[in-house]
Amino acid sequence: MNAFNSEKPRRFPAFTILLIIIVAGLAIGGYYLAPRFERNAPQITLTPDSDVLGVAPLEIVVTDQGAGLKSVTATLSVGGTEHNLAGEQYAEPVKEKKLTVAASKIAGIKEGPAVLRITARDGSLWGFFKGNETVVQKNLTIDVTPPTVELIADDRYINFGGAGAIVYKASPDTVTSGVRIGDYFFPGTKGQVKDQPEHFFALFAHPYNVPGSAKAVLVATDKAGNTREMALVYELKNVKYRKSTIALTDSFLQNKVVPLVKDADARQGAVKDVFVAVNKRLRKENEDKIAAITRKSTPAILWNGAFAQLSNSKVEANFADERTYTYNNQPIDSAYHVGYDLSVTKRYPVEAANSGRVVFTGDLGIYGNTVILDHGVGLFTLYSHLSSIEVKDGESIKQRQILGRTGETGLAGGDHLHYGVYLQGVAVLPVEWWDAKWIHDNIEPKLEGRSGEEIAKAQAPAPRKTTRKRGR
């Protein structure tokens, strides 16, 4: 018998080893395959979230950030007929799919109740390798008929760069309506026409920067995006706008232009380059801000009668003057002057042209200290280069109330008032609104509910007087 006991090496049973291998394999496989078994279903969003479908497109966005999309189908059932909008299978999963649907583009579609059904399945191995599925079903109404409009009263003549007004009716399904010309839109509002609460009244312009050949169109759009258009017919009276040249001096550039540049580095450049930057970039920023402010108006008329020119004032510069700026006798830039420059004496009291509400007070770049009044239904007046401001935002203003005093803030070359009139963000000819006869002939009859025939007769030029020679 040996003095020392010897033990045999411990062996793992083959079954245990096999089990370990299987578990390890499953763990490794699970690590790599787990994402393929993800349970996050695809997402489906509809924009806009509307219950009608017509001309306006409905955008369907299907996404899956996990395994990716494997298939997307979309159908639209209307009156027992099913229209296939999409039926796609993807060999390689995709993360996003966009579909655009417009009822007006579906051949043979009928109006009435409809059901939109979108089904999306991803490439996951979950659900016995079928993947995750999302189904969205939405009840809609198919509407491809545009609203109706009826023109009640319009203008026979409109000045180039000036304003016009119309009265019209639109069917109850209308959600937006007004006048479109070029890239500009002038919405109509209800409740302005005497004894006709359902009639729309719209002020609009034939802007100075829109070609005379451009046609104004009355448009009405419903919830489904269906649009009715009616051409407005009027004679466009030519208005000749001046061209002028302004010679820039070093003193003006250093004392007036350079301080308007906020960037210290930019102020160090050549003075003519600084001017061009101010005249282009800063002017555009300021005019964009004015346009944004003067596109948000109260839907009620706040003014009464003709607008008042600054008392005792002299016109120094006209509306839509095309100005060429020169430096050392060389043209370096140009711009349109979208208002009237009025001067009296230094620090002269600036009066409100008509009753309204203050919607802006403060510094406005090249315009300096500025007050903007909202007179309702898209009509605004602007008062710039003020040395002081004596009203506050939101304040109700009476005609001839003092707003501030004239000055030479901003890009003003001397003490004066820059006065502008705006319609829905568009600068228009101010002199019309100073003219009591123009308002009496073109605006007030429409607000009084007079017929188009009556207005046309009032606007017609007086017949020429003729003298017959007696025969011998």
Residues of each region from the PLM?
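Short, surface-exposed linear segments at secondary-structure transitions and domain or protein termini
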Residues: 93-97, 238-245, 391-395, 438-444
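Extracytoplasmic
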Residues: 113, 135, 153, 163, ...
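Surface-exposed loop/turn and intrinsically disordered segments
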Residues: 2-198, 203-211, 217-242
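Contiguous, well-folded functional domains in the mature portion of proteins
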Residues: 158-160, 170, 177-180, 189-243, ...
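Non-catalytic extracellular/periplasmic "stalk"
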Residues: 163, 170, 176-321, 326-329
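Short, flexible, glycine/charge-rich loop motifs used to bind or transfer phosphoryl groups or to couple energy/partner
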Residues: 49, 62-63, 304-305, 347, ...
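Catalytic cores of peptidoglycan-degrading enzymes
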Residues: 307-454
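Juxtamembrane/interface motifs at transmembrane-helix termini
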Residues: 90, 248-251, 449-452
